[in-house]
Amino acid sequence: MERLNAAMAPAPVRPVKVLQFGEGNFLRAFVDYMIDIANEKSDFNGSVALVKPIQMGTLFPAFKEQDYRYTVMLRGLVDGQAVEQTRVVTSVADAVDAYADYAHYADYAKLPSLRFIVSNTTEAGIVLDETDEFSLCPPKSYPGKLTKFLFERAEAFDYAQDKGLIILPVELIDDNGIMLKKCVKALAKQWALGEKFEQWLETACVFTSTLVDRIVTGYPRGEDQAIWEKLGYQDNLLDTAEPFGLWVIESPRDLSDELPLPQCGLPVIYTDNQKPYKQRKVRILNGAHTSFVPAAFQCGYDIVLDAMNDPMISTSMQKTLYDEVIPTLSLPKADLMAFAEAVTGRFRNPFIKHALLSICLNSVSKWRARCMPSLLGYVEKTGELPAHLTFSLASLMSLYRGGKLTGDGRLECQRDGQPYYLQDDAAVLNFFAETSSESPEEQTKEFLSNEAFFGAELCKVPGLVESVGASLREILDKGMRTVMNEKFGV
């Protein structure tokens, strides 16, 4: 079978406008995919040059063998209907190894058409490394690479204001652009690059903070041959993802003319405040996971899709969102309802096998960040406890209860006589290992009194200790499914 190539998917030569640190599945099915659509539907007329952000491993040979073409396949549910959309992406024009060919990489700093820098270097990528050195080609860290690249660009264009760059980090950390800018400014001072450069960073460059949301499942191992047959060509860079996508870009400047993604029908929001959108994602999408997964696992399920096909569990999850979470959020209700509806469809995606136990990683800190604000907001607004969020605390506790510490820092628990293993902060695992012989009521009071776990004394929320303790006792006495049927059965 013929390999995907430029003859199969011809495209005009476009100027490189985007330098992208990272060539992984997410960026290819998200940013590069959107730029490809912008090239088709607007006058953006730009291409992407990929930069390998670390020394190890690369997909670059595969890119070159396919003339920088690859296929994105979006699969999932849209408005309750199964969809499968394929697109050959032609927006990538080059792939540069900054370690093996630094001169080629550095030439991009002198390219007049360059306007954007995109990065996905993982959460650990945006960290200040004070041992990094300007003399390295390239510097070790991503902030180091970016600082040196921007300095060389400023020097090449004599600090022209119109040759600054727009920085678009998509790393999954809060205020990623603010954090990246702090690192760059710190290195500029440490490396004594001068006040002129520091001023150019402030006036000519734009550091945006972004929020991204799309589940990218990557290369479909085990399905690739069948998909190639359907496509009619071989694609070793095939990338799969869900149809849902969201890119919220917080910027001090209006970027919609230079990067006209919303005008192309793409799910991109430009704003001067991304926090309400972050809150929506954390409270609804992530909060739904964290609130229902412990109970679903204890009902005998192993993946999200199977749990969502249980009417009792899916109805309970939806009531959590619509009745208890959404009333505590500030965005327009219609936006929140639509987002919650999309979340339900995403959880039912038949192409995604999301293991419940993987979601249970660090459940206590996740509950604090994702569910506790909704619970406290609901109590403040109504003066009552939210039934489903309150029960989620009891189901979380019962997931951990009775566990024994293993030698490798996990908690071994039992479900129907079979072991399962939980990973969490050592203090959390020690707490449950040491208190599981206590009565449910005593353990609950101690758990909810632990400010280190919650950053607050949840035991002072009226009725919370009593309600969680009573539910925990019921779960231990009757089993999760029986108790959920009694409380929330449909």
Predicted regions and their residues:
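Substrate/ligand-engaging "lid" and interaction regions
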Residues: 1-490
